Regions:
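C-terminal substrate-binding subdomain of Rossmann-fold SDR/epimerase-dehydratase oxidoreductases
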Residues: 1-112
């Protein structure tokens, strides 16, 4: 999967807005362009929360895509923009925001 931190998405949009667009109908993908294995993503969350998840593996489901990530080459070519946030930092920032916003204590977070 391609996980993209919100600040990178906002910066990507600003890069487009701040610069004249040669083709006003061109579509740009904004994403991380670095696929992350789902188990690696889960491991990052576990580490940030200092909790261990119970993982149940299932067969691939109809409609599931094996690999998916954004091709951001046009965004880079036209605006020299690349996302900067790695998965560890982005997940940590999101979890910190979530716990603070919802006033949840990490040790009280119920995971199922």
């Amino acid at each position: 999967r391609d996980f993209t931190y919100i600040d990178d998405i906002v910066e990507g949009i600003f890069s487009i807005i701040k610069n004249p667009i040669k083709d006003p109908c061109k579509i740009y993908n904004i994403g991380n362009n670095k696929p992350v294995n789902l188990l690696d993503f889960v491991n990052v969350i576990e580490k940030c929360l200092d909790k261990k998840f119970k993982i149940e593996f299932k067969d691939i489901q109809p409609g599931d895509v094996k690999d998916t990530y954004a091709d951001v080459s046009d965004l880079y070519l036209d605006f020299k923009f690349k996302p900067k946030t790695n998965i560890e930092f982005g997940v940590r920032k999101f979890i910190d925001w979530y716990l603070n916003y919802y006033k949840v204590k990490k040790w009280k977070l119920k995971l199922e």
